[in-house]
């Protein structure tokens, strides 16, 4: 058994503030990936009044052995009121930046793209000053569905590659590394004004050389932002941690990624794909992109 090192211990949150966020989420019947995936940063994020909203859940149609989200082959139908409830939460929490993600919905023809579009539109209507980041699944390679999401105009589109290609069969058996790269390439080709983002976990048995090769693959498809964090085993039934990577290695990857041309690399043991995501607003000011008037993608 690999013993968890001191650098992975987090401070206890101030539960009064955390409780108020949880109360709001329960009031609006919303799920968060913070809770469903047992994120170690939940206390810090809830204390700061931020959350990553999990749509179309809480059950997922894939059973990835690293993930703590419940598996359900046939989840409940989509709730048409969810986009408006999520937009209401954005207003109540006064969010400058919102991260919206979802479970995999392989049971739906469009993978849930229409729900992403409806939610982006609802947030735009209720809180036009809020920048929107969507963290999407691979949509089973349905690129028309991806185009629908891109046309809705989120500022950031995130799709996590999760791990190095050698480990996909064990870590992400229903995923496909090349399909994930193609998704990110299509974001760059179809909507170059959108900031693209991806994230990976380490500590699953990959080598540093494999991580560097993955980073190079992401740059080749035009990925702008990269997050790297330590994998933590949610329960004994999930994949075991193979190694706890020291903070110095994360810092080395951060420096290397910046030298490769990523606009931002967030790399530390406790980094998760949505951790401090609001910092992208400063990045957008530093590297502005001209967004054309809304129109269907041709």
From Swiss-Prot:
Binding site for [4Fe-4S] cluster 1: 34, 39, 45, 274
GO cellular component, one term: cytoplasm
Cofactor note as given: Binds 2 [4Fe-4S] clusters per subunit. One cluster is coordinated with 3 cysteines and an exchangeable S-adenosyl-L-methionine.
Binding site for [4Fe-4S] cluster 2: 60, 64, 67
Keywords from the named record: 4Fe-4S, Cytoplasm, Iron, Iron-sulfur, Metal-binding, S-adenosyl-L-methionine, Transferase
Limits of the Radical SAM core domain: 46-263
CDD domains xrefs: Radical_SAM (cd01335)
Location, primary (coarse class): cytoplasm
Keyword Glycosyltransferase: no
Single GO term (MF): 4 iron, 4 sulfur cluster binding
Family listed: Belongs to the radical SAM superfamily. Lipoyl synthase family.
UniProt-recorded name of the protein: Lipoyl synthase 1
């Amino acid at each position: 058994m690999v013993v968890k090192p001191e650098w992975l211990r987090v401070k206890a949150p101030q539960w009064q503030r955390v409780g108020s966020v949880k109360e709001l989420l329960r009031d609006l019947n919303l799920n968060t990936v913070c809770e469903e995936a047992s994120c170690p940063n939940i206390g810090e994020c809830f204390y700061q009044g931020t959350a990553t909203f999990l749509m179309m859940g809480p059950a997922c149609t894939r059973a990835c052995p690293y993930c703590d989200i419940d598996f359900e082959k046939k989840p409940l139908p989509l709730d048409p009121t969810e986009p408006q409830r999520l937009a209401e939460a954005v207003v109540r929490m006064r969010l400058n930046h919102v991260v919206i993600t979802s479970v995999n919905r392989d049971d739906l023809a469009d993978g849930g793209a229409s729900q992403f579009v409806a939610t982006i539109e609802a947030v735009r209507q209720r809180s036009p000053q809020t920048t929107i980041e969507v963290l999407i699944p691979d949509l089973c390679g349905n690129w028309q569905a991806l185009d629908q999401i891109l046309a809705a105009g989120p500022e950031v589109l995130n799709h996590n590659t999760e791990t190095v290609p050698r480990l996909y069969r064990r870590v992400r058996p229903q995923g496909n590394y090349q399909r994930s790269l193609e998704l990110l390439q299509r974001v760059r080709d179809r909507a170059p004004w959108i900031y693209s983002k991806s994230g990976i976990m380490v500590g699953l048995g990959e080598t540093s050389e494999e991580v560097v090769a993955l980073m190079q693959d992401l740059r080749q498809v035009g990925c702008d932002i990269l997050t790297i964090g330590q994998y933590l085993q949610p329960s004994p039934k999930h994949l075991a941690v193979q190694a706890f990577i020291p903070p110095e290695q994360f810092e080395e990857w951060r420096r290397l990624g910046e030298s490769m041309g990523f606009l931002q690399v967030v790399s530390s043991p406790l980094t998760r794909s949505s951790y401090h995501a609001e910092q992208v607003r400063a990045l957008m000011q530093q590297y502005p992109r001209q967004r054309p008037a809304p129109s269907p993608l041709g």
